[in-house]
């Protein structure tokens, strides 16, 4: 593969060193587990968390005479992902044997794709920001390829004092290896890339994106150079399993390499591991090249071929993806780019928002979902799937505000009650006497009392009419937030002689 530099050096991304500025170059190989009930070449289950060695077929265990049979659903999922990445779909691809020895690789080789992958070049657009001016920066990250391959098993070193065990539940599970071009220039860009890629495969339903379960993990390639120079020697950081760790690994590795080069040393091409406890990378082994794996076409598998109709049928059924959904939210609902970006960041959040916004004002729904619901979930360490407030309940609260039944302040209190106790919002309002006061006589009485008790403030308002807001706040406080805010404001201004 010939590396092409498509980015113009950007001073705001330079890393200052003792002898001048440096630029970090990042590319990623992301292993995404295909969402499928069975493995790539066998009928064994892919269910996570099952007892050790319970999801293993004779094919997965590499028993003599067992032959691989391609899982068509895994092929479909790879093509769907390629379409979602706006990539070239190769209607003819080959499976190869990647030869290496490891205890949890029973075949002695991994079935992968080398020269002829199922998906070719594509792209992902990431967005950084907003900056201090509220602007976003869109950056296109190239996709080099996507290929299908088997996962290996798992070596267990903590089960016995002197022996290691092997769990083959993952052996043969289908992976999509999604290889980016070296187009990223900071840890923030790399984190945004991984976040966007995970969002896309979740929208597509081709990978669950659960990094804590190993369903998505990244090999991060890092090198540094002086701005304007050619690519430096890269080091690969293996199996980074969280977006936060990706950022930490890149920042540490870039600093490590800069330190070596500034001291007159050279960077050795190698594979490294990231230690999240120490926040540093350490050497694992020298980096292999393709010829070290002795790739050759797998003689047990025919070339994988399909036609345009196969691809077209999958393309027609693709769901609306994050970028398209964000554009629609901005165009049709009048949301800001920031709010739309937050709402489409996860499919579950977007689905929740659309359920709340159906038949209601989009901006109001967005404010409640982003500021109140997501804020509450962040405080309690829950995600959107665990929310105790359903879209119907949140929508009902918004409806009560619009109908004038409750004020905005009371709505906040009502939301907290629904969040902690559940229940129907309208019934809670009735049972707890939370309806706002719309009786102008009662409101006028409260306004008169506040004005009479604060003659000094009345004089100040005459000089500075904007201070009338203080009286509005006092009346709202006196009525327990139940008074209609618009009615209070109108009466305060009328009583104080402030013209509209």
From Swiss-Prot:
Keyword Nucleotide-binding listed: yes
Domain of life: Bacteria
Single GO biological process annotation from the record: glutaminyl-tRNAGln biosynthesis via transamidation
InterPro entries: Asn/Gln-tRNA_amidoTrfase_suB/E, Asn/Gln-tRNA_Trfase_suB/E_cat, Asn/Gln_amidotransferase, Asn/Gln_tRNA_amidoTrase-B-like, GatB, GatB_C_1, GatB_Yqey_C_2, Gln-tRNA_amidoTrfase_suB_CS
Transmembrane recorded as keyword: no
Listed Gene3D superfamilies: 1.10.10.410, GatB domain, N-terminal subdomain
SUPFAM superfamilies: GatB/YqeY motif, Glutamine synthetase/guanido kinase
Catalyzed reactions per annotation: L-glutamyl-tRNA(Gln) + L-glutamine + ATP + H2O = L-glutaminyl-tRNA(Gln) + L-glutamate + ADP + phosphate + H(+); L-aspartyl-tRNA(Asn) + L-glutamine + ATP + H2O = L-asparaginyl-tRNA(Asn) + L-glutamate + ADP + phosphate + 2 H(+)
Keywords: ATP-binding, Ligase, Nucleotide-binding, Protein biosynthesis
EC code: 6.3.5.-
Disulfide bonds: none
Molecular functions (GO terms): asparaginyl-tRNA synthase (glutamine-hydrolyzing) activity; ATP binding; glutaminyl-tRNA synthase (glutamine-hydrolyzing) activity
Task of the protein: Allows the formation of correctly charged Asn-tRNA(Asn) or Gln-tRNA(Gln) through the transamidation of misacylated Asp-tRNA(Asn) or Glu-tRNA(Gln) in organisms which lack either or both of asparaginyl-tRNA or glutaminyl-tRNA synthetases. The reaction takes place in the presence of glutamine and ATP through an activated phospho-Asp-tRNA(Asn) or phospho-Glu-tRNA(Gln).
Listed PANTHER family: GLUTAMYL-TRNA GLN AMIDOTRANSFERASE SUBUNIT B MITOCHONDRIAL AND PROKARYOTIC PET112-RELATED, GLUTAMYL-TRNA(GLN) AMIDOTRANSFERASE SUBUNIT B, MITOCHONDRIAL
Subunit structure: Heterotrimer of A, B and C subunits.
HAMAP family per UniProt: GatB
Membership in a protein family: Belongs to the GatB/GatE family. GatB subfamily.
Annotated protein name in UniProt: Aspartyl/glutamyl-tRNA(Asn/Gln) amidotransferase subunit B
Gene from which the chain derives: gatB
């Amino acid at each position: 593969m010939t590396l092409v530099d498509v980015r113009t050096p950007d001073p705001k991304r330079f890393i200052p060193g003792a002898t001048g500025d440096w630029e970090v170059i990042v590319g990623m190989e992301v292993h995404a587990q295909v969402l499928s009930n069975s493995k790539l070449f066998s009928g064994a289950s892919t269910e996570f968390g099952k007892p050790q060695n319970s999801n293993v077929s004779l094919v997965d265990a590499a028993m003599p005479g067992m032959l691989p049979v391609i899982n068509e659903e895994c092929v479909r999922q790879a093509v769907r992902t390629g379409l979602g990445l706006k990539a070239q779909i190769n209607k003819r691809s080959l499976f190869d044997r990647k030869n290496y020895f490891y205890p949890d690789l029973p075949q002695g080789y991994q079935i992968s794709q080398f020269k002829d992958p199922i998906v070719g070049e594509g792209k992902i657009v990431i967005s950084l920001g907003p900056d201090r001016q509220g602007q976003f920066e869109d950056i296109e990250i190239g996709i080099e390829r996507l290929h299908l391959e088997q996962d290996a098993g798992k070596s267990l070193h903590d089960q016995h004092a002197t022996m290691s065990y092997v769990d083959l539940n993952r052996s043969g599970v289908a992976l999509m290896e999604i290889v980016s071009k070296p187009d990223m220039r900071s840890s923030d860009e790399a984190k945004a890339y991984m976040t966007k890629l995970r969002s896309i495969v979740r929208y597509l339903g081709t990978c669950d994106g659960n990094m804590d379960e190993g369903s998505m993990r990244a090999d991060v390639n890092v090198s540094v150079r002086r701005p304007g120079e050619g690519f430096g020697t890269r080091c690969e950081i293996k199996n980074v399993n969280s977006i936060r760790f990706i950022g930490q690994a890149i920042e540490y590795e870039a600093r490590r390499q800069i330190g070596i080069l500034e001291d007159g040393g050279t960077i050795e091409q190698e594979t490294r591991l990231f230690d999240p406890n120490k926040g540093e990378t350490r050497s694992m082994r020298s980096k292999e090249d393709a010829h070290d794996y002795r790739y050759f076409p797998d003689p047990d598998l025919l070339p994988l071929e399909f036609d345009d109709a196969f691809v077209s049928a999958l393309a027609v059924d693709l769901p609306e993806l994050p970028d398209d959904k964000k554009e629609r939210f901005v165009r049709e609902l009048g949301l800001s780019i920031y709010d739309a970006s937050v709402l489409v960041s996860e499919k579950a959040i977007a689905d929740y928002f659309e359920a709340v916004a159906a038949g209601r004002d989009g901006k109001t729904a967005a404010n409640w979902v982003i500021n109140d619901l997501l804020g509450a979930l962040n405080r309690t360490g829950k995600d959107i799937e665990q929310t105790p407030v359903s879209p119907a309940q949140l929508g009902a609260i918004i409806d009560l505000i619009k109908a004038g039944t409750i004020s905005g302040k009371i709505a906040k209190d009502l939301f907290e009650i629904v969040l902690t106790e559940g229940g129907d919002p309208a019934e809670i309002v009735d049972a707890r006497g939370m309806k706002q006061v719309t009786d102008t006589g009662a409101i006028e009485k409260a306004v008169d009392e506040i004005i009479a008790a604060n003659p000094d403030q009345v004089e100040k308002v005459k000089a500075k009419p904007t201070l009338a807001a203080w009286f509005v706040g006092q009346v709202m406080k006196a009525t327990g937030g139940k008074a209609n805010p618009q009615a209070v404001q109108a009466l305060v201004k009328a009583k104080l002689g402030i013209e509209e």
